[in-house]
UniProtKB/Swiss-Prot annotation:
The keyword Plastid applies. GO terms for cellular component: chloroplast. Belongs to the ycf36 family. It comes from Porphyra purpurea. Its main location: plastid. This is Uncharacterized protein ycf36. The keyword Amino-acid biosynthesis does not apply. It comes from the Eukaryota. It holds the Pfam family CGLD27-like. It is found in: Plastid, Chloroplast. Keywords: Chloroplast, Plastid. InterPro entries: CGLD27-like (IPR009631).
Amino acid sequence: MNLYNNQCPVPLEQQPVNEYNSLKNSWFFCWPTLSSHSYNKKITITLIATCFLVSPVLLSIFPIAKLPLKFFFSEFIISSLITCFILIRLYLGWSYVVKRLMSATVFYEESGWYDGQIWVKPSEILVKDRFIGLYEVFPLLNKIKNTLSCLSLMTTAPAILFFYF
């Protein structure tokens, strides 16, 4: 039984649980909900794809015959930065939803005329939303944070070595 239907004036697409479900079912934002193997595979494919995309530009800057190490280091650094931006977008989307799930009030607009209103969640809806936020969304945010940390650590060595070679 959906508790929102009976008690909630918030439009369906603006209800926190529906925002959570739409993120969970979207092509891009579902990445952290996948198993660790599938998630890491998607991140690795993204990293490799960005390597191929930045290669032509970097080949014009660092000829591979003359400066091979600079080319490979800069390729990895730029690809990692682009992947980090993608991960930051994932993090921001999920953090917005968890903020709305954990909040006792919901800001919404009925007509789209910037006449926002605030709805106070009843206790049973608040408990359900917080349960979803704590046990479903916070682990996803931690997964994204851990990925960002690992990627930034992996980028540190090539960034330092770039200036020595």
